[in-house]
Design a protein with these regions (language model features):
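Alpha-helix-loop-beta-strand connector modules within alpha/beta enzyme cores
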Residues: 60-81, 127-149, 181-202, 241-254
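N-terminal capping/small domains of soluble enzymes
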Residues: 1-83, 89, 241
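Glycine-rich phosphate-binding active-site loops on the catalytic face of alpha/beta enzymes
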Residues: 44-49, 111-118, 173-182, 206-207, ...
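Active-site beta->alpha loop and helix N-cap motifs at the rims of alpha/beta catalytic domains
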Residues: 55-129
Length: 262
C-alpha cells in the first residue's frame, strides 16, 4: 500500500502532493492560502537575498527578498504542515545567507534552486560533477535544516554522477522532473535508480489528476510538486487531487481481487 503521508528527511508530510516553488507562492496571501489548503506542504517562491521585482530581469527569481519570508515563516508554521523554503543565489555565499536565515526562522526543509538559468550562468553547478559536489557540500555544512536540491529538466552530467555528488554531500532529497529524461525513465526515476533508492526523490511537473499522481508514486517517488494545475485552478486543486488519488487507489486495490481469485 502506498504511503500518502510520507516521511522525507525526517519530516512527516500530511499529504504527498504540494505546490511547486513559484506556483501561487510569492505573496503572504498566496502562501497562507496554501497553508490552509489540502496541500501537503507550503513551498515558497525561490527566495534571494534582496528583492527581484522586475519581471524582465531575472526569469523565475522575482520575489520580495529573504527578510519578507523570514518575517512570514512563523505565521505559515501555525498551519502545522511542513514549510519548504526555496532558495536561490548567484553566489554560494548568497545561497548560504538566505538558507541560514530561513532555517533559523523555522523552515523545515531548504530547497536549493539549481534549476534557474541565471543560477546556471553564475554558479555553473553542472559544469562538472566536482563543481556540483563542491557547491552542495559547502551549503550543507553551513545550514542546519535538511536540504533538497532542485535539478533542471536537462542536465549535462550523468545521473550516477549527480546522485553520487548529492549523497557524498549528505543531501537527503532531490527534486526532479517527472518528464522522460532518457526515452524510458523520467528524471525522477533515473535519479532514484542511480542512488539505489538512498535519495528521497520528489517529482515535479506533469501531474494534473489523481491517476497521474498514482502512476508517479507507484514508481517509488516519495511526493509530487504540482505547478501548472495550481496556477490554473488555485489551491482548491489539492482537494480534488486528494479525492481522485484516493479513488484511484481504491479502484486499483479492488481490481486486484481477493487472493486466489485470478
Amino acid at each position: 500500500m502506498l504511503d500518502l503521508t510520507p516521511t522525507i528527511a525526517g519530516i512527516r508530510f500530511p499529504f504527498c502532493l504540494m505546490n511547486a516553488a513559484g506556483a501561487l507562492s510569492t505573496s503572504r496571501e498566496e502562501l497562507l492560502a496554501l497553508a490552509h489548503s489540502e496541500s501537503g506542504a507550503v513551498v515558497t517562491k525561490s527566495i534571494t537575498p534582496e528583492s527581484f521585482l522586475d519581471p524582465g530581469a531575472c526569469c523565475g527569481l522575482e520575489n520580495p527578498g529573504h527578510e519578507y519570508y523570514v518575517e512570514l515563516l512563523p505565521e505559515l508554521r501555525r498551519a502545522s504542515k511542513p514549510v519548504i523554503a526555496s532558495v536561490a543565489g548567484l553566489t554560494i555565499a548568497e545561497v548560504i545567507l538566505v538558507a541560514q536565515a530561513l532555517a533559523a526562522a523555522g523552515a523545515d526543509l531548504i530547497e536549493i534552486n539549481l534549476n534557474d538559468p541565471h543560477v546556471h550562468t553564475h554558479l555553473s553547478p553542472f559544469s562538472s560533477a566536482g563543481r556540483l559536489g563542491e557547491i552542495v557540500s559547502v551549503i550543507c555544512h553551513k545550514v542546519s535544516a535538511p536540504l533538497a536540491v532542485k535539478l533542471p529538466s536537462t542536465v549535462p552530467l550523468s545521473f550516477p554522477d549527480i546522485a553520487a555528488a548529492l549523497l557524498d554531500a549528505a543531501i537527503p532529497v532531490a527534486i526532479c522532473h517527472n518528464t522522460p529524461a532518457n526515452g524510458r525513465l523520467s528524471q525522477a526515476e533515473a535519479i532514484l535508480q542511480a542512488s539505489d533508492g538512498r535519495l528521497n526523490v520528489i517529482g515535479v511537473g506533469g501531474v494534473a489528476s489523481g491517476a497521474e499522481a498514482l502512476a508517479v508514486l507507484r514508481r517509488g517517488i516519495k511526493a509530487i510538486q504540482i505547478g501548472s494545475a495550481v496556477v490554473k485552478e488555485g489551491v482548491g486543486v489539492f482537494a480534488r487531487l486528494k479525492r481522485e488519488l484516493a479513488d484511484s487507489l481504491e479502484s486499483r486495490e479492488s481490481t486486484k481481487g481477493p487472493v486466489g481469485t485470478r
